[in-house]
A protein has these predicted regions:
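N-terminal amphipathic/hydrophobic targeting modules at extreme N-termini
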Residues: 20, 31-32, 48-51, 56
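Intrinsic-disorder-associated, low-complexity terminal segments enriched in Asp/Asn/His/Tyr and depleted
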Residues: 12-13, 22, 34, 45, ...
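C-terminal substrate-binding subdomain of Rossmann-fold SDR/epimerase-dehydratase oxidoreductases
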Residues: 253, 274-397
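Short Gly/Ser/Thr- and charged-rich N-terminal loops/segments
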Residues: 4-6, 20, 40-41, 54
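The catalytic Tyr-centered alpha-helix of NAD(P)H-dependent dehydrogenases
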Residues: 216-227, 251, 259, 263-267, ...
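Alpha-helix boundary/capping motif
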Residues: 13-16, 27, 37-38
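Hydrophobic alpha-helix immediately C-terminal to the catalytic Tyr-X-X-X-Lys motif of short-chain
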Residues: 230, 234, 238, 270, ...
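N-terminal Rossmann-like NAD(P)+-binding domain of SDR-like oxidoreductases, especially those catalyzing
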Residues: 65-252, 379, 388-391
Length: 397
């Protein structure tokens, strides 16, 4: 089942009262103060229901369970496309995983395969809640901050929400991590950024030290890149002033199963249309150039970066460096899906509005991340298209 419901009004995202928390596994609705009680009681009482896996008097399991409890990963935006894949990956490794998501653009169904996992704690709540953030960071050994406004369509439609939802929660998380560090507890953090921060930089290939070049403030399209650039400045300021172990990753067109086309993502839109026999709609002339990387490659890079101390305090491009035009992508999707669909062209003004500007070429330099962790993407474009098409086909009655 695909998901991607529209973002609810701003007041639904920026309430300062603590939300109810859904502690998965026993179906109870938890209030925020109950989390700590359940956690500590669960370690003492193997029979009480709780957020964490219970320690049972089995000598063959205790060492394994203690090892699991030693690493708790918090994923903000964990029911989203990338976050849900990351949660699965970390659970397979043996981590305890806390997912927090307000389900504004994420979808709980993305976690359906792991929702009953004994080491997963799913919490429906907003990370602009001070008490919630303090509680969850206090329980975590590392943080993957993925929650953000997503998709060009959403950004063009709701620039206020884009800016506020990108900047305020990041500042709140960093401030709390700084307070914890001052008390002697440093928690590594990965901050998810985006290739959008490069803006209109005219270079053929973008490296991490290149200038960020944005358009006019009268064009809402740039609000996303600017707000994520502010996130980066904040993160690196906390590294410089407080020595926090933070790494920033700029994602370049991450694709794969569970990604929805509801917010303008091009590959799922193309694949869904091709399988349904509908026209594939290409914006402008289709000569915009992008590089697509599979989510499985990306999450492995993210985990390696947060586990590499030398990566702290630096920014990394994360993606593929194999370019393809959007028009050629549409043709490739039609070919790989054996579709009879046609290609139709649509102007930006019809797709978005008169103020919209696009980026003609977006290709990353991956030398820095290769030097740091040996990263090279393993899946080619045909494999990526096939994996997305297989997902859609399996969901079609």
């Amino acid at each position: 089942m695909r998901c991607g419901r529209q973002v609810s009004p701003l007041r639904d995202h920026f309430q300062k009262s603590s939300p109810s928390l859904n502690g998965r596994g026993n179906g109870r609705i938890l209030k925020l103060p109950d989390l700590t009680k359940r956690f500590t009681a669960g370690l003492r009482n193997s029979g009480s229901p709780g957020v964490r896996r219970r320690l049972r008097p089995d000598p063959f399991r205790i060492s394994h369970l203690m090892a699991c409890l030693m690493t708790t990963s918090l994923i903000t935006g964990g029911s989203g496309f990338i976050g849900s894949h990351l949660a699965e990956h970390l659970l397979r490794r043996g981590d305890d995983v806390i997912v927090v998501d307000d389900l504004s653009t994420g979808c709980q169904n993305n976690l359906s395969g792991i929702m009953e996992h004994p080491r997963l704690d799913f919490i429906e709540g907003s990370i602009d809640d001070v008490a919630l953030v303090a509680e969850l960071l206090g329980r975590s050994d590392r943080v993957f901050h993925l929650a953000a406004a997503v998709g060009v369509a959403l950004i063009a439609k709701e620039p206020i929400q884009t800016i506020e939802r990108n900047v305020y929660p990041t500042q709140l998380i960093l401030d709390r991590l700084g307070s914890m560090a001052q008390r002697g507890r440093q928690v590594p953090c990965f901050i998810a950024s985006t290739s959008e921060v490069y803006g209109k930089n005219p270079k053929d290939t973008w490296s991490e030290e290149d200038d960020l070049v944005f358009g006019a403030t009268t064009r809402p399209r740039w609000s996303y890149g600017v707000s994520k650039a502010i996130d980066e400045f904040l993160a690196l300021a906390y590294v410089k002033q407080q020595g926090l172990p933070i790494v920033v990753g700029r994602f370049f067109n991450v694709v794969g199963p569970r990604q929805t086309g509801a917010y303008g993502m091009v590959l799922p839109r193309f694949v869904e249309a091709a399988l349904a026999g509908r026209p594939l709609v290409v914006h402008d002339d289709g000569h915009q150039v992008r590089c697509f990387a599979h989510v499985d490659d990306i999450i492995q890079a993210v985990v390696k970066l947060i586990e590499t101390p030398a990566a702290s305090g630096r920014v990394y491009n994360i993606g593929s460096d194999q370019p393809v035009s959007i028009l050629d992508l549409a043709k490739r999707v039609i070919e790989r899906t054996n579709s009879s669909s046609e290609i139709q062209f649509q102007s930006y003004s019809d797709a978005y509005d008169q103020s919209f500007e696009d980026i003609r070429r977006r290709v990353p330099d991956l030398q820095r991340i290769h030097d740091a962790i040996g990263f090279r993407p393993t899946m080619n474009l045909n494999d990526i298209i096939d994996s997305v098409a297989n997902q859609y086909a399996s969901e079609t009655p």
